[in-house]
Amino acid sequence: MQQTVIVAMSGGVDSSVVAYLFKKFTNYKVIGLFMKNWEEDSEGGLCSSTKDYEDVERVCLQLDIPYYTVSFAKEYRERVFARFLKEYSLGYTPNPDILCNREIKFDLLQKKVQELGGDYLATGHYCRLNTELQETQLLRGCDPQKDQSYFLSGTPKSALHNVLFPLGEMNKTEVRAIAAQAALPTAEKKDSTGICFIGKRPFKEFLEKFLPNKTGNVIDWDTKEIVGQHQGAHYYTIGQRRGLDLGGSEKPCYVVGKNIEENSIYIVRGEDHPQLYLRELTARELNWFTPPKSGCHCSAKVRYRSPDEACTIDYSSGDEVKVRFSQPVKAVTPGQTIAFYQGDTCLGSGVIDVPMIPSEG
């Protein structure tokens, strides 16, 4: 009996190539599914969903495959955007892409795949799955510049049992070449960057529509002197340099702490200031593909583009771990996701929980 693969299509070149590969080289019945998570200009947000859907339509018509659209705009606002705003209001810096994968793409979209009679869900993520073992393992994509396992690290492994990542073994150059050879309408379309609902506008400009400006003090961590004013502590993230508007300093200034209750931010001068670095952190909201034992030696990424950092994981409680790095790590940001690896295998992830105000040590 012919099986059905449903391709999550975004209107970009990656998912277009996924649909093409399944249609051209497999016996699967292929269906395209476009997911709309944000209403145009909804609540001040911008999104290119209309143009993206038109591109999905063009690709599917060329490939002669059926296609559908589903709107999760309401659920996205409730399960991703609302949390995004709440975390920012509390001083954290969440990653909405990781939230979207967990709450929408590999939950609600999975259910839609089942409704449509799909056997598999295929996406254009640059990562791999090892299904040969008893437990599904998430692996890095073979292209280190495009590896997206970090963004999948917060997704429950139970949600990946029927997922296919055909681009995991490829690099972007190969994908572009396939798209060009197949004359896909999206072959030369630029990759999307940034957060969907923010669009091309400055991040602060978007955020202040929901978290109003509130003037507060900028405090020099070393001297404890007030050196300037800011428009809201929640707009700033640990390690941030841009947007401080502090003149008269020979060295660059960086945010090292925030006091949300007092609406103050703390800065240090110089990119190598010791307060910018941490040797350990706590991670909460753990999600494991391959649960490590306490004392496990592995590596970790504290943000998407950060290098792997050697570390040790120790369980401090059932839902938290203590992470100790071999070398001090710069600009560790509360609210961001830390993903753990052993070689190419992603062990899982947690949410970084470090003090908003650094210690005096």
From Swiss-Prot:
Gene Ontology MF annotations: ATP binding; tRNA binding; tRNA-uridine 2-sulfurtransferase activity
Domain of life: Bacteria
Ranges for region Interaction with target base in tRNA: 95-97
GO cellular component, one term: cytoplasm
Main location: cytoplasm
Keyword tags: ATP-binding, Cytoplasm, Disulfide bond, Nucleotide-binding, RNA-binding, Transferase, tRNA processing, tRNA-binding
Residues under site feature: Interaction with tRNA: H125, Q336
Region (Interaction with tRNA): 146-148, 303-304
Reaction equation(s) it catalyzes: S-sulfanyl-L-cysteinyl-[protein] + uridine(34) in tRNA + AH2 + ATP = 2-thiouridine(34) in tRNA + L-cysteinyl-[protein] + A + AMP + diphosphate + H(+)
Entry annotation: catalytic residues: C100 (nucleophile), C196 (cysteine persulfide intermediate)
Cysteine pairs bridged by disulfides in the record: C100-C196
Localization in the cell: Cytoplasm
Role played: Catalyzes the 2-thiolation of uridine at the wobble position (U34) of tRNA, leading to the formation of s(2)U34.
NCBIfam families assigned: PRK00143.1, trmU
Protein name: tRNA-specific 2-thiouridylase MnmA
Annotated source species: Chlamydia pneumoniae (Chlamydophila pneumoniae)
Primary gene name: mnmA
